[in-house]
Amino acid sequence: MVDLKTKAFDISQNFTISLDGPAASGKGTIGLILAKKFSLKYFQSSIVYRQLAFDCISQKIDVTDIDAVIALSKELKLDNNFDLENENIGNIASQIAVISEIRNNLNKYLINLVKTTPRMIMEGRDIGTVVAPDADLKIFITANPQIRAERRYKQLQAKGKTCILDEILRQIILRDKRDKERKAAPLLPASDALIIDTSKLSAMEVVEEVTNYIKNKIT
């Protein structure tokens, strides 16, 4: 049996990391650094939900029309020509993500992606518990809601987007509530996940903690 350290540092080995956590906890930044460090393909699973939200908007489908959204989720195709990162799309994505039929349809896409990619880090809310329960390393990132709101605020400002900190905090708290209370794959760490609170840590400090964990892990 190949140990975790060998899988991580030997690029000829298959190696999968699941990276879960709430909105604006730092997953994206951390995931990209880890992907570069360990030669992994990085994929943000929320993109499939944001793409579906965008498709609903562009095709004028009301998100309360559940049957129509479910049908659309069966035909999902990722299109990189549009900005899927704005808050409106994110909020719609959060609403439709609570619907179990939609999650099941989109998870099929994600599960196949994990299975067909030898070295991957996939970021999301339920990767370690649902999409890739057999991942070699499961990481759960969390942080204080106020800290997360401030991070998102700075990110949006850096992109030149108008935003209000209190509104971002309100939306983060609302998303947390939806994620934790949904019946289909609620947000929670896998039982064997490495849990890291990033409230007082930089992205590089988190990467260092993950790297040390890999080096010292005894399988």
From Swiss-Prot:
| Keyword set includes ATP-binding | yes
Instruction: List the NCBIfam families hit by this protein, alphabetically.
Output: cmk
Q: Which ranges of the sequence are coiled-coil?
A: none
**What top-level class of enzyme does the UniProt entry assign?**
transferase
SUPFAM superfamilies referenced in this protein's UniProt entry, alphabetically = P-loop containing nucleoside triphosphate hydrolases
Q: What is its EC number?
A: 2.7.4.25
**Under what name is this protein listed?**
Cytidylate kinase
Q: What is its main location?
A: cytoplasm
The Gene Ontology terms for molecular function here are: ATP binding; CMP kinase activity; dCMP kinase activity
Q: Which gene encodes it?
A: cmk
List the Gene3D superfamilies hit by this protein, alphabetically.
P-loop containing nucleotide triphosphate hydrolases
List UniProt keywords, sorted A-Z. Answer: ATP-binding, Cytoplasm, Kinase, Nucleotide-binding, Transferase
Annotated compartments: Cytoplasm
Q: Which GO terms describe its biological process?
A: pyrimidine nucleotide metabolic process
Residue positions annotated to bind ATP are 21-29
Q: Which reaction does it catalyse?
A: CMP + ATP = CDP + ADP; dCMP + ATP = dCDP + ADP
Query: Gene Ontology cellular component?
Result: cytoplasm
Family to which this protein belongs: Belongs to the cytidylate kinase family. Type 1 subfamily.
